[in-house]
């Protein structure tokens, strides 16, 4: 890992005895032991988990990536990691099952537990039904194949369109408009400038979430309608 002995000894010392408490309002529970996992909120925890989970990437690389070659210039995409969320990509049924087998073996060896209730498969396609061979399992349990999955707030559909994402963002943003209007009414401030500033601070971040990905998509009318609806309600 490139870390010297002093750093490793310091980390061992930090995790030799880990205790925690739970805060509920102004109250604290009694201390209890935490024999597994990383310290919550500790600055080193994200780095330590990244080093830990990187073992999975190495194993998939070793046994064959079976990923997706987006273009000749790009490297083969086979995994996305964000905190403890893992996304596996493959362009074949056998390739994905191989990745799942590696994940199962690596998780067992590292003492990780995979939540199968939150583990789904999306087959990206132009249409039609799934083939008989398009089935996958993890440690002997069948995995559910779904038409849509939300990853980091973005809805991924089988056709790789963002129409469902637009509707989801618009609905979430629309629910926030009454709160802004109520605040303006409470403080007795009906200036358009104040309304626009509140909209830009509270609603616009919701509407533009993930726009780095879908910003060039043509069908964004549902997003703009939230802005027009908010203006009409304000007036």
Which ranges hold each PLM region?
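Short, well-ordered alpha-helical packing segments
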Residues: 12, 57, 87, 97-108, ...
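Active-site palm subdomain of RNA-directed nucleic acid polymerases
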Residues: 51-83, 87, 96
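Short, conserved micro-motifs composed of acidic
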Residues: 11, 16, 26, 113-147
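Conserved, non-catalytic sequence blocks in retroelement Pol enzymes and Pol-derived host proteins
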Residues: 1-6, 37-47, 69-74, 90-96, ...
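Non-catalytic, peripheral interaction segments enriched in hydrophobic/basic residues
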Residues: 83-84, 118-120, 124-126, 150-235
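Secondary-structure transition/capping motifs at alpha-helix termini
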Residues: 1-6, 62-63, 109-113
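Conserved pre-catalytic core of RNA-dependent polymerases
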Residues: 1-55
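Catalytic palm active-site di-aspartate
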Residues: 37-41, 45, 71-92, 103, ...
């Amino acid at each position: 890992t490139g870390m010297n002995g002093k750093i490793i000894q310091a980390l061992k010392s930090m995790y030799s005895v880990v205790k925690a408490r739970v805060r509920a309002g102004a109250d604290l529970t009694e201390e209890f032991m935490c024999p597994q996992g990383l310290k919550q909120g500790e600055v080193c925890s994200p780095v330590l988990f990244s080093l830990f989970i990187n073992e999975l990437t190495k194993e998939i690389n070793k046994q064959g990536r079976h990923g997706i070659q987006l273009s000749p210039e790009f490297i083969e995409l086979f995994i996305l990691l964000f905190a403890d969320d893992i996304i596996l990509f493959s362009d074949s049924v056998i390739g994905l099952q191989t990745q799942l087998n590696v994940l199962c073996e690596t998780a067992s060896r590292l003492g990780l537990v995979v939540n199968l209730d939150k583990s789904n498969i999306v087959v990206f396609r132009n249409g039609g039904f799934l083939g008989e061979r398009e089935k996958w399992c993890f440690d002997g349990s069948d995995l559910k194949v779904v038409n849509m999955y939300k990853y980091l707030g973005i809805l991924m559909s089988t056709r790789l369109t963002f129409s469902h994402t637009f509707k989801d963002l618009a609905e979430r943003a629309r629910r926030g408009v009454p709160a802004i209007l109520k605040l303006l009414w409470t403080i007795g401030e009906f200036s358009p400038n104040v309304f626009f500033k509140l909209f830009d601070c509270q609603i616009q971040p919701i509407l533009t979430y993930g726009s780095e990905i879908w910003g060039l998509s043509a069908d964004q009318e549902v997003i703009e309608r939230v802005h027009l609806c908010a203006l009409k309600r304000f007036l």
